[in-house]
Amino acid sequence: MQNLFNFFSHRSWLIIPKNLFISFSNDLNLDLIRENITWKTIDEINISNSLSKLSTIDLLDMYIVEGECINFIDKEKLLFLSNNSYIYKFNIDIWIPTMLFEHFKNNQLLRRYELDIQNEYIVSTDEIGVKTDIENYDETFIQADNGYDIFYYPLGVVSNLLQCKIIDLKKILSFPCSLYKIPFEKVSELKDKYLMNLKK
């Protein structure tokens, strides 16, 4: 299990329906550069700009889309892409520490749950919407060595979405995935817009 916690200790990812991926890919101008690799080895593949790195895992009717740049995809874009569809967004960063879970559906943000620590000791919560069924998971399975169990909340949500136990999530580290590159210009555009929105 610790391999799973270690991998997701600093990750951002989406879960989107398969039929939405073409629109998502076109919007980001994704360029496929490798196939049939795994998340176990993906960090060993160097790309000049880590923000340009995006990977996908095919899970029958949905994709897990992982990449640091997902942090910079603004809310408006996700709302637009969720038209007649859904998008789940997740972020875990133990180094801050912080975590985020968002659920978009039919151009609406239905649920947002974010935790971070302020003043070193106080856990701050930002919450929109009511807790959903997919957020009810067996918390006893999340026991990370670093002691930040509550910040792995997104893994509990993902286990319910994939209808598996949290302990079984480690299998996805060995699933075949595809590696894409986002053009540097597109990454800069996403980042600039993200920083601009922070100033508002």
Where on the chain are the PLM-derived regions?
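Alpha-helical protein-protein interaction elements
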Residues: 5-6, 31, 87, 172, ...
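Residue-level signal for functionally critical sites in structured catalytic/ligand-binding pockets
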Residues: 4-10, 41-42, 105, 109, ...
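Long, compositionally biased intrinsically disordered terminal regions
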Residues: 117-200
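Short, intrinsically disordered low-complexity segments
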Residues: 33-115
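Short, extreme N-terminal segment that most often corresponds to the first beta-strand
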Residues: 1-34, 196-200
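Short, flexible coil/linker segments at or flanking structured domains
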Residues: 2-4, 78, 89-92, 98, ...
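Intrinsic disorder/low-complexity signal
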Residues: 1, 26, 57-60, 65, ...
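Broad structural signal for hydrophobic residues in well-ordered alpha-helices, predominantly aliphatic
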Residues: 24, 77-81, 158
